[in-house]
Amino acid sequence: MRPARTDVHDGLAYALWLPEPARRAVRGGVVVLHGAGSCKESHYDFARAAIAVGLAALTFDQRGHGQSAGPMDGRAIDDVIEMASLLRLELGAPDAPVVLRGSSMGGYLALRCAERVDAAAVVAICPASASGLRRALNDGSLRFDADHAAFGALLDGGELQPIVAQLPMAILLLHAQGDEQVPVQHSRELATVLRAPTSRLIELPGGHHRSIQHDDELQAVSLRFVEKALGLR
């Protein structure tokens, strides 16, 4: 199964996935944010799972990745907001319910952007911390082209715990206990400040940094969570 369309918007390469037209207007959509060094195609499996339950999905290459223009820089948050607006345009309503789903760095950005996007819910998989991303930026271990000054400035003062503590929407945190890149303790600390009663943290015993994002069962768990958050279950 292929995307309904692949295109470039404001320098951002994206793939749009649409369910059957008869179901499109009532189900909402998901903007999928990949991790550092990844690309939109890596999350086509989740996009296919989303359209199977009647949700639209939009995956895109963040700057410094894939086919998008320019390095990762201070536009990262505005780019997510723009992609959410584009998905709402495709859904035919500026207030269409949109969920953010991100992995690692994408999980960080999903939580960081949730309020400005007016996200209906967030699914954050092994979400990175601002300090962890800052260290990786400084030591050169991030595997993508970045404007160090601009992206570093975006990260500075952007730790997630105080941000998450202010978010009213349902948030699902998924984290492998054996994650060798982002310690599970980070998600445990975020879980202590979740506000919505339907929010939760699911820990996967063992595993590693990439265990969860492509796991069929956990993708299904994520989509059930999204459907409930959107009032579709």
Regions found by a protein language model. Name each.
Residues 1-23:
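N-terminal cap/lid segment of alpha/beta-hydrolase-fold proteins
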Residues 36-48, 62, 185:
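The serine-hydrolase catalytic nucleophile loop
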Residues 42, 71-91:
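Alpha/beta-hydrolase active-site loop
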Residues 50-67:
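Conserved alpha/beta-hydrolase
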Residues 70, 207-217:
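Catalytic histidine-centered segment of alpha/beta-hydrolase-like enzymes
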Residues 112-153, 211:
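Hydrolase active-site cap/lid region
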Residues 166-168, 173-175, 179:
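Short beta-strand/loop motif that positions the catalytic acidic residue
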Residues 169, 183-192:
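Short alpha-helix in the alpha/beta-hydrolase fold that links the catalytic acid
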